[in-house]
Amino acid sequence: MTQLSTRLVRLLNMVPYFQANPRITRAEAAADLGVSAKQLDQDFNQLWVCGLPGYGPGDLIDFEFSGDTIEVTFSAGIDRPLQLTSPEAIGLLVALRALANIPGVVDPEAVRSAIAKIEAAAVVMGNEATGSVASVDTRPFSESHAVAAVRAAVRDKQALVIDYYSASHDTLTSRIVDPIRVLLVGDHSYLEAWSREAEGVRLFRFDRIVVARELDEPAAAPETVRKALPDTSFFDDDPLLPSATLWVARSVSWIFEYYPMRQAHELPDGSFQAVMTYASDAWMTRLVLGFGSAVQVQAPEALAYRVRNAAVAALESYQVTAQA
């Protein structure tokens, strides 16, 4: 997970944690939650501005601090399962149906299951969400034969032969792969698999798999690879692509949710350092410039110089315009 995702999970768990451990000390809580005392205080500050609509006194999550101990005084309902209102149920169902119609993004079976559960809950609550949403889009979910074959191979643990389009090289190649798992990252689904040709783990984007055929042999990825954590380095299927070390200001930490990065870690001042792989210097230069001073290239030097020169050229063009 990204830094933001990890923190969100921790924030959601903090209120139930402190309710289950009343009067626990700051040091003990920080140790249990795996964060520093400074980060724990930042999490408290974040939770203090979260709560129920109205967002006034008595609506926000609150804690009582007595000496060095901590206790929850108002949970704002975060410790209980969410009960959807009728408009919320309708919104979720519409979003799920729209998401399901984007090829390769989600597993249709998972979407059907989620919709069925929400509709059932809506009926129990006496809502009219089921009838309201059914008229929006009742077409059955479907995906390409290639994507269906990929999901089946992952489920059955069978080897695959795929025709895959490489956007960086603009080529279509045929590969035999041993599926490991399906990953959902950002707006796309990826097949993580062992490439027999490259003898390494590669990611294959669903919408770039043109043809897929299940082979009559079991998947044979190395055991160490199967047990390893998911690899979400999007461009690992092309080892010739360069990588850049970036400094990212905390104010734009949402960048991790939109661009694939690895080796991300938080610095003492709250900013971040991460490594990002990219396809071309020109594209990377435009990306970094778009964030102003909030994202800076630390390495390689050639890319840093390119970004700096592009920024200077942009400033000079404004000066020329002003003089004219």
From Swiss-Prot:
Q: Secretion signal: which residues?
A: none
**Domain WYL spans what residues?**
139-219
InterPro entries cross-referenced by the UniProt entry: CBASS_pafABC_assoc_protein, PafC, PafC_HTH, WYL_dom
Question: How does the record describe its quaternary structure?
Answer: Interacts with PafB; with which it probably forms a heterocomplex.
Belongs to which family? Answer: Belongs to the PafC family.
* Function per UniProt: Does not seem to be involved in pupylation or substrate degradation.
Q: What is this protein called?
A: Protein PafC
The protein's organism comes out as Mycobacterium leprae (strain TN)
- Gene of this entry: pafC
